[in-house]
A protein has these predicted regions:
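N-terminal glycine-/serine-/threonine-rich beta1-alpha1-beta2 phosphate-ribose binding loop
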Residues: 5-6, 10-94
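ADP-ribose/adenylate-binding Rossmann-like module
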Residues: 93-109
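Rossmann-fold NAD(P)-binding glycine/threonine-rich loop
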Residues: 104-125
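Rossmann-like NAD(P)H-binding beta-loop-alpha module
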Residues: 122, 126-188, 195, 199-200
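Substrate-binding/catalytic subdomain of NAD(P)-dependent oxidoreductase enzymes
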Residues: 177-276, 281-283
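C-terminal catalytic subdomain
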Residues: 287-325
Length: 372
């Protein structure tokens, strides 16, 4: 069947979706029975030069026009931010349109409200592109591992930070130089604060934790440290001890079912699979009670990998329209779920001291156990 969709875009991912839907339209039709057509596109600036050709007739700057268009069945939100995006997604759900979004900040901060609205309006939200770019980790948790109690998730889920730490480690660059290189190569934004502060990864961790444990984790219950305090000296000392430094997101439940969610620079043994994830790549280790340990690796950002996830969601949305029902996208099941504050969390620490009399510190022993 013909599925009309609209896009509201601000970044290159939207261009990637437009390009790749056109390029692989026949393949998608053969595999899914859905003929995807992007019928309207809302942008902030009509005059802006675009890397792909979009017919001027389908362009507008007013997304409300698109939500009001009865021929449109699916709305794709790729504008980022939380205020206007919240209005757009809410209006689309109220207009009974399926929503596809790649907006992790929006879901982390307003997810509980939006999924309740989706449930009330009887239309789903799809959000594969919100976490880890092209890695289909949302589908894994919602479908592939649905029979498992999730014991823990450990992930490198911010490509900017991983690129910076990799260059510091492998090329000996300072933090500032590595970040500048990441910006020049397009791995980091002009304002990289959200990435380097750890909050981009934390937003993704909130989504993964909420899916895994069935209740929405509040942002204030998440412990976040960025890589902006990591120096080349930290990395060199860690290497002498046999560790690599990664910005790691950790999600796990204790014996009482309290869920800890944190993102911080972490020492990983150099033999650990996550210690060997380099550059802008992402990787996520999910531990389930039935399946055991599983690993997912791939590009966590970029136009094509992220558009792959958006188009996957468009196909799922099309299947919902053609074949019928699906839940809102989030099924609450941890009705008594509680977060675990960082001050009750037990973990090992790395402390680097500058001492004036090394002899008096020789009785200190160095940690040799795994630090996660």
């Amino acid at each position: 069947g013909l599925v009309g969709s609209e896009m509201c875009i601000r970044d290159s991912v939207g261009a990637g979706v437009f390009k790749n839907v056109a390029q692989n339209r026949d393949l998608i039709l053969q595999r899914t029975g859905a003929d995807l057509q992007i019928t309207r596109v809302a942008v902030r600036n009509l005059a802006k030069k675009r890397e792909i050709e979009i017919s001027p007739e389908i362009l507008t700057t007013n997304w409300r026009e698109l939500v009001a268009d009865e021929s449109v069945q699916v709305v794709v939100e790729l504008i980022g931010g939380t205020d206007e995006a919240f209005d757009l997604v809410s209006a689309s759900l109220r207009a009974k349109k399926i929503v596809v979004t790649g907006n992790k900040a929006l879901l982390a901060e307003k997810g509980q409200e939006l999924f309740a609205l989706a449930e009330q309006c009887g239309v789903p939200i799809y959000f594969e592109a919100a976490v880890a770019g092209g890695i289909p980790i949302i589908q894994v948790l919602q479908e592939g591992l649905v029979a498992n109690h999730i014991r823990s998730i450990h992930g490198i889920i911010n490509g900017t930070c991983n690129y910076v730490l990799t260059r510091m480690s492998q090329a000996g660059l300072s933090y500032a130089d590595a970040l500048q290189e990441a910006q020049e190569k397009g791995y980091a934004e002009a304002d990289p604060t959200l990435d380097v502060s750890g909050w981009d990864a934390a937003h993704k961790a909130i989504i993964l934790a909420s899916l895994s444990y069935g209740f929405w984790i509040k942002t204030e219950d998440v412990h976040v440290e960025g890589i902006d305090q990591v120096s080349i000296e930290d990395i060199r000392f860690a290497e002498r001890l046999g560790y690599g430094v990664k910005l790691l997101s950790v999600i796990r439940a204790d014996a009482d079912g309290r869920v800890e969610v944190r993102t911080q620079p972490t020492l990983l043994p150099q033999s650990h699979v996550l210690a060997n994830v380099n550059g802008a790549f992402n990787a996520i280790v999910v531990n389930g009670d039935i399946v055991g340990e599983t690993l997912f690796y791939g590009r966590g950002a970029g136009q094509d990998p992220t558009s792959s996830s958006v188009i996957s969601d468009l196909c799922e949305a099309a299947a919902t329209l053609i074949y019928g029902a699906r839940h809102s996208g989030f099924v609450p099941h941890g009705l008594y779920g509680r977060s675990k504050p960082i001050n009750e969390t037990i973990s090992r620490y790395f402390v680097r001291l500058t001492v004036y009399d090394p002899v008096s510190y020789t009785h200190l022993t160095l940690p040799t156990k795994r630090i996660v």
